[in-house]
Amino acid sequence: AEMALARGQHGTSRMVSLGERERVATLGFRGEALPSIASVSRLQIRSATGDEGGWEVAGPFHDGVAPAPCAHPRGTTVEMRDLFHNVPARRKFLRTEQTEFRHIDRMLRRTALSRFGTGFRLSHDGRVVRDYPPADTVARQAARIADVVGSGFVEQAIEIDDDRSGLRLWGWLGQPSIARSQADWQYMFVNGRPIRDKVVTHAIKQGFGDVLHHARQPAYVLFLEMDPAGVDVNAHPAKHEVRFRDQGKVHGFLSHVVSQ
């Protein structure tokens, strides 16, 4: 029943009341993604919760097809084929296959860092490109970070964890010796959501002080946890930028923790 519901517009919405818009604690909350994808592609969802086999549902969200039994290991597979096959005007705006795959790969790597408890496998042209098993220990989390960011980062990073005034910052902070000429080793997550925010970036760099050359970029994989009511995740259409209710408090906290 839930699989059929997942394809319906707003069927997977996490919102029960309008007031929850001020306390968004999930990556998606409107329930629009799957039906939107299904309307412009051939979408198949297969899922199983145990060893008794699974269920699958395929086709556009409006055709009323019920889930059918299928063989599937525990977990969920969402397969999308022939994107924009029914909207050729949109299809011509797609970049090359290589470029589009890079976008997918980048998104998967960010997601893999924010969801250590979930395993991810990415296949391309019939070949497994990324395979991240669930990371349920600190050692396995470090191993995943090494796979995603690079072993050079993990070997030169310091584990941090600080909690005060309703804010918690934890993760891996690269030492100044591995600072980069560009910000390609910067991964920041707020309540599990990957972001790029000027307040956060400035605070972290300020925390390094004089030990980091102004032209160099710090390397980090950091997680900020806070009350969802204290951050607006709808500040930007792409959801990459956020707006903090108390920017000064967040900035000061981040800068202080990094400086320690």
Spans of model-derived segments:
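N-terminal phosphate-binding caps/lids of nucleotide- and nucleic-acid-binding domains
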Residues: 1-260
